[in-house]
Amino acid sequence: VLSTAREMADFDVLCMQEVSVNYPVLTRQTDGDQPAVVARLLPGFQVFFSAAIDELSACGTYRQKFGNLIATRLPVRTVEHVALPYPNPVTQEVTPSMQRICQVTTVQAPWGPLRVMTTHLEYYSQVMRHAQAVACRDLHLQGCALADFPSKTEKGTPYQPKPLTTDTVICGDFNFEQDSAEHASMIQPHQTHTLYNAWNQLNGSAAHPSTFRLYDRTYGPEPVGCDFFFVSESLKHRVQRFAVNQETKVSDHQPVLLELN
C-alpha cells in the first residue's frame, strides 16, 4: 500500500483508514501492529494513530485497536482524536456497527497552519453515517470559529496559543456517494466557511471517479466513488491536482491524491 502511495507522489501527508492492531482476521496473519509498520516504513515521518475501537481481546490477554492514521513529514502542531456520533438507527434490520472517529491534525504547511481531518464513516446505517458527516462539517466550522474569534491565552499552560486556522482538508472513506444526502450536508453553503469537493474544483460538475468496488464486488455490483477530499473556502484556490489510481488492486479502495500549491 505504501509503495503504491509513493508511486503516485512524493507525499507530505498520508491519511489511512481501517488501520488495525491485533486483529489477525483483518491483517491476514501478517504483522499485527499496523501503525508500527507504517512508522517503520516511513522514516522521517511522524505517525499518529486514532483508535475508534480500543478493546480487550476475547481471550483477555491483549488489546485490539482499529481506526485511522495520519503520517506526515511536516511539523505537527496539534493532534485531536474526536469520537463521532453513534446514534441508534432504529431500524428493523439488525446490522453490524461500530464507533467511528475523526482524527484532526494541524500541520505547518509552507503558507501556515493546515487542519487535516481524516475519517471512516459508518457503512451499513445511513442514519449513523449522515450524523457523522454532519459532525465532521461541524468540527470544521468549530475550528474556523476559533480562528475567527480567538480565546484568551496563557503561555506555558494548556491555554497557550494554538495554531488556529480556517484552512481545512477533510478526507477518507465516507461510504456515501456524490449524489447522497450526506454529501449534500458536507458541502452545505456557509456564509464564510463552505466546504467544497476538491474533485469538482478542478472538474466542474463531472462525476467523481470510482474508488470502491472496481475489482472486489463483495459489497455491491457496481463501482462507486466514496473516497473524497473536501477543502475549505479559504483553501479551494490552492487545489492544483487531484488523482485516483484505478489500476492498483492492493486494497478494495483506490488511493486518492490531492495536491495543494
Where are these regions (language model features)?
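Preference for well-ordered, secondary-structure-rich cores of eukaryotic proteins
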Residues: 31-37, 41, 50-51, 134-135
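Active-site regions of metal-assisted phosphoester/phosphodiester hydrolases
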Residues: 1-13, 46, 54-56, 60-261
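Short, flexible/disordered intra-domain loops and linkers
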Residues: 21-33, 57-60
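Short, conserved active-site loops that position catalytic residues or coordinate cofactors/metal ions
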Residues: 9-23
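Short linear capping/connector segments at secondary-structure termini
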Residues: 19, 52-54
